[in-house]
Every structure is written in C-alpha cells, then in structure tokens.
Amino acid sequence: MSKKISISLLLLCLGLFSQAQSYQKMPQGVKTTVQGIDVEVAFYSPSIVRVYKTPEGSSYDKKSLVVMKEPEETFVEFAMNKEYIRLKSDALQVEVNSSTGGINFYDATGRVLLKDKDYGTQFTPFDDAGTFSYNVRQAFLLDKDEVIYGLGQQQTGKVNQRNQKLFLRNKNMSICIPFIHSVKGYGLYWDNYSPTMFTDNPQEMSFDSEVGDCADYYFIYGSNADGVIAGVRDLTGQAPLYPLWTLGFWQCRERIRVRMNCAKWLMNTVIGKFLWMESFRIGSIGDVILTGTP
C-alpha cells in the first residue's frame, strides 16, 4: 500500500514539474507554448495588454510601425492552476488556458470583457514571392448583443460593425484601421499591415491577414470611450494637428502635387476671401469697383 502511495506522489510531483516547465514567468507577463504556438502575454500598463503569438520555435522579433509605447513598470500578480495561468493588474485580469491557448480578459471586478477563442489562432504557411511567410488568422468571442465601432472610414453606411464582412485595404475614400472599440469599454488593435479580412458572425469575430509572421494584438481597457481613446494615444503616440493648408497638399490622393500650385492656390484663396469680404462694403479700392462675389 505504501509503495502505491509513493508511486502516486512521484507521478503527481512529475506532473507538477512538467506543468511548471510549460511556461516562463516574466516581470510583467508570461510566455508559454500551447498547441504548437508560442504565446506571450505582457502588460504594457495596468490597462493595456499585448498578446504576441508565433509558430512554436520561431525566432521572429517584430518591431511595430505603429506602437511607440514601451512597457511601463506595472505590478502584476501571478497565479496558476491545472487549467489556467492567471495575471492580474489593478485594472485587468487575464487568463491563459494552458490546454487550448484561449485567453480571457476581465475587468478588476471579474466581469468578462473579451475572449480570445480556444484554438482560435491559425498560421497557414505559403510562399510570398520567394519569401516564406504565413496567412495569419485570429478569432475572438463577443457577447451576442455587444456593439462594436471602428475599423476606419468604411463606406457601408453602418456604425455598428457587428455581423459584417469587410476587406481592410486602404484605397481612395476607404481608410481602413484594424481597430475596434466595444461598448463594454475596451478596444482591440490588430497590429498587421497586410490586406486583412474582418469577419463577424454569430460564431466568432476574426481578423484574417494575408501576410504575417505573428499574431499580434493589443487589448486596451478604458471603461468608456474616452478612456479607450486615451489608451490608444498612450500606445501609439499623440496625433499631431497639421496646418489647414496641408490637407490638400499631401494628405489626399487627389492632392496638389506641385508646391508652386499650392502657393498659387493659397494666394488665390486669400485674395478671394478679401474680395468677398470687401464686396459688402460701399465704395472702391483704388480704381477697382467691388461688385458682387468673385
């Protein structure tokens, strides 16, 4: 009997040791490997979490073209059990399923915000004009009646982006940004610059990018719209306010292409406004009689 108990204890210890070796604790997050995918979850602030996934063993180190923020010092509580690895800051709780790779996001009170779907990450290898790469797909689970906004300047006439299939690729009159904002008080930025298919249906919401070496997204919790936008600005940097004259010079495809034309347009506009204002006055300037608008 004692021999059986000893064997059972040994197997239990080996199981716990094996489980302990399946993840790597970081100062503000965790690394683990699930279902052939390396998963890294890191807090960039108490309310911003980055999820970074690559095929197992990949050494790809991505440098974002959009995200400027470096992780700030954040106190993160760490716990685990047989099923989940749990991370908790002052604002967020994150659970990583050690069997399926699914990730659940909660607010500080334990309310479910978003679910990264179990087995929801897919890497499909392909030859990108001689360069090995992947089609990258990531799926999420939203509440049935949850409203989401965003995805840029879409010409669909809809504000709520639920139950839609949109091809995110920039062109004239269609500015695409792979970012959603939920009425539950969080935002999600999918950090991939290739043409991407956004799909939302009763089963799931997903981003399916044509080219990528990783699945990389940022979860931003702000409790309301102002808080989410503040989080986005913290993550990507403050948006500069350019002078009015630049709007037609370089911010549009149908722009003024020659700097001299820009100067002529500006001068004509100034003169036109001057004449328009002076036309309301009685009299003349020099020999020019002002009558009507130009």
Residue ranges and their predicted role:
Residues S22, D38-E40, E77, Q93-E95, ...:
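Short, surface-exposed charged micro-motifs
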